[in-house]
Amino acid sequence: MLRLKIVSPERIEFEGEVTSVKVPGMAGNFEILSDHAPIISILTKGVVEYAGNQLPILGGFVEVQKNQVSLCVELKED
C-alpha cells in the first residue's frame, strides 16, 4: 500500500492509502506502486488516477519516498 497526499493551492484534495497512482509525467504517463524507487518528477497536463478516481490537472510535481507519495498540483478548472 501507498500513503497518498494530493495538495492544490486551495486545499488538500486527497489523503489516504491506495494501491497505485498513475500520473502524467514529462515523458508520458507512469504508475507508482508499493516499494517504488525514490523519485521527484515534474507533472504535465493530464489526469491523476488513484483509488478509482480521476483528477484532471494542469501540472505540478510528485515525490515518492518509502511508500509515501506526495503530489502538489494545479487543478484544471471546468
List each language-model region with its residue ranges.
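Compact, glycine-rich, soluble single-domain proteins
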Residues: 2-78
